[in-house]
Amino acid sequence: MELMMAIGYLGLALVLGSLVAKIAEKLKIPDIPLLLLLGLIIGPFLQIIPSDSAMEIFEYAGPIGLIFILLGGAFTMRISLLKRVIKTVVRLDTITFLITLLISGFIFNMVLNLPYTSPVGYLFGAITAATDPATLIPVFSRVRTNPEVAITLEAESIFNDPLGIVSTSVILGLFGLFSSSNPLIDLITLAGGAIVVGLLLAKIYEKIIIHCDFHEYVAPLVLGGAMLLLYVGDDLLPSICGYGFSGYMAVAIMGLYLGDALFRADDIDYKYIVSFCDDLSLLARVFIFVFLGACIKLSMLENYFIPGLLVALGSIFLARPLGVFLGLIGSKHSFKEKLYFALEGPRGVVPAALAVTVGIEILKNADKIPASITKYITPTDIAGTIIIGTFMTILLSVILEASWAGMLALKLLGEYKPKYKEESHH
């Protein structure tokens, strides 16, 4: 694809995406479903942006956009508020996440008539298990509910994003697309390394930023560090020693620690970074969802719509609720609170970026996938069902769960009356 064509497509996505996002704001609905539909219209329906060109652009826009969103989301999360809900968040991001992944994978294999142990289903489960801060944060800024409930779901979504990426990488090892000698060791090095390196860079940045007033230069400094984390963890280290760390998880950890440190120090540079991240996150959302819609070919929709719809419904109404109820057994939460958590897990940016990235990888490296997998399903069908299944999961979960968030909060949790002026969680 020519450079000027790519610039034209990006410009078109931004102009139309901004108009659509403004309409969504006026209608008081999340912009994600409208951006996805816009992508479908200018992609497969009107053929303005060819599917292959959309995929090419996504290879760059997806990973860079994820950095913006994870950094911005973690940067505004307060550790003091996180401490209040940490037990629930840890359960949701471990037990609930894993159960949701496994049940979604099981349903996927059942719908597509694959062996129950086939890694194809569990790859879909890993891609779609992460919930979405880009949907939840705007929803809870409008819905009056107990701040602890809102913070729990927002924190869960910020930290399960990198977990979704890590678990997808580990399962890709079974496809021969991610060098993996031992999935368990990979998981430990990817997550553990990310925490150590993310904290280390955050500490270095904290010292530099507090002692030198960077002002408008602070945002590129922090963003550049986040991009280098991704490069070092996901590319440089694995090529040198065979083991890396999850760059995305390191970005989230760095954002959380640095944002909190600068906020508590009342450092002027904090505001520069927040407004910069907000602007970039908006750009990333427009690119990721418009190009996800545009990536889809009409033939894909025709072939995979029914299985895609079934696995999406299974993921939203079976996998997530079972994951929440099993994950929170014996916790302090009432049945109604658990039900609210179960029905508020919209999927968004990370599943969108992962589905297309994984789809591209599978199609590019079809010859590397083991025969034990391809004798039941072709690489083209793997990529198609995962992309359409994820698309349907995002579309349905965001439309339904953002629409009923306020009504369910009122029905299940009752009207929230603050006892005193709550400290903002943003």
Curated annotation (Swiss-Prot):
It is found in: Cell membrane. One of its GO terms (molecular function) is identical protein binding. This is Na(+)/H(+) antiporter 1. Belongs to the monovalent cation:proton antiporter 1 (CPA1) transporter (TC 2.A.36) family. This is a Na(+)/H(+) antiporter. Can also transport lithium. Changing residue 161 to A: Loss of activity. Disulfide bonds: none annotated. It is a multi-pass membrane protein. Keywords: Antiport, Cell membrane, Ion transport, Membrane, Sodium, Sodium transport, Transmembrane, Transmembrane helix, Transport. Changing residue 347 to A: Strong decrease in activity. It comes from Methanocaldococcus jannaschii (strain ATCC 43067 / DSM 2661 / JAL-1 / JCM 10045 / NBRC 100440) (Methanococcus jannaschii). Gene3D superfamilies: 1.20.1530.20. Active at pH 7.0 and below. One of its GO terms (cellular component) is plasma membrane.
